[in-house]
Amino acid sequence: MIAAEDMYRLGSQRSAIRELFEYGKKRAEVVGVENVYDFSLGNPTVPAPDCVNETIRELTQTLDSISLHGYTSAQGDLVTRQAIADYLNQTHGTHFTADDFYMTMGAAASLSLCFRALTTSREDEFITIAPFFPEYRVFVEAAGAKLVVVPADTKAFQIDFAALTERITPHTKGVIINSPNNPSGAVYSEETIEKLAFLLRKKANEYGTEIFILADEPYREIAYDGVEVPFVTKYYDNTLVCYSYSKSLSLPGERIGYVLVPKEVTESRMVYAAIAGAGRALGYVCAPSMFQKVLVKCMGQTGDVELYKKNRDLLYEGLTKIGYECFKPQGAFYLFVKTLEEDSDAFCENAKEEDLLIVSATGFGCPGYARISYCVDEDMIKRSFAAFERLYKRYRT
């Protein structure tokens, strides 16, 4: 074969989410876009805060082209990294410096760099908690390691600690946590994070190894009803934070984020250097320079989270009224729904017959559920209820 078989497979087969999205575009050409209820993508629909476009205008008017679009240092612009450190220190009572941050092209790049930096053997394992973002498997395996999955706690969507304990071995390099969670919308409680930190310290001491938490946090600021999202570095020293501004600033196409390597991490400068080395090896040589500058002026800003909350309440109340069993999200912008048959793939195929595009959670490691993205137009949610009711009646009458 002229091309790498594993890469060909990834490139020739879209993810289930992207496949559904493309189907929706084609279906809209047939029946009209207003008749397709596309809940497939987690693509922010709340506008970016005003500071984003205002800062872009200011930068283009005051900086010359070379200063605006030229390379930053490999680890990122110093002013940007210090601004992030200052903001987190003020918000969380931490003591980070600019040297703790490595700027990246979003959380996906951050995770990929961390997996590559930490993997030292084909026997290395990273553990994730179902339901989980399916691309974790792609990123981990591309780094040469193995992904181990802990089954979902479908009562509260926290962590099944008995199942996690069974899966920690001397080969465990890290545990990936995603809170607020895609796809469930759950937020890990402080009790959960404390219990996780205790367990990992215990197991690391037992095996004489280092076990990292990789905190995947693109939804950190999107939380509802006063729910607090614990800042994990305060609970566990060996935490690497993989952050993206895609969701908080509604900038998914601009690809800007960071890896945070606190000084409390064991051999933190070695880990940081390995992440920088992974950036070289993978070709992530410079995060977008203009948007690094934009961040400085927009630190702490978010899109209007209340609009997501309004959609959450509308969708949750509408579907539960019909009879669906749903987990009420505490954060992010996804509703996790128990499917009306055990085969969630089949259920989502049946939903397509009503032009409802929802994502089976089989790929998220949680069969029997479906993800409904509510970062969509409010009117579409309202119009979709008749289709959801028809689907429900097909199973219950």
Residue ranges and their predicted role:
Residues M1-L20, K25-L63, Q75, V79-Q82, ...:
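PLP-dependent class I/II
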Residues S67-L68:
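Pre-Walker A segment
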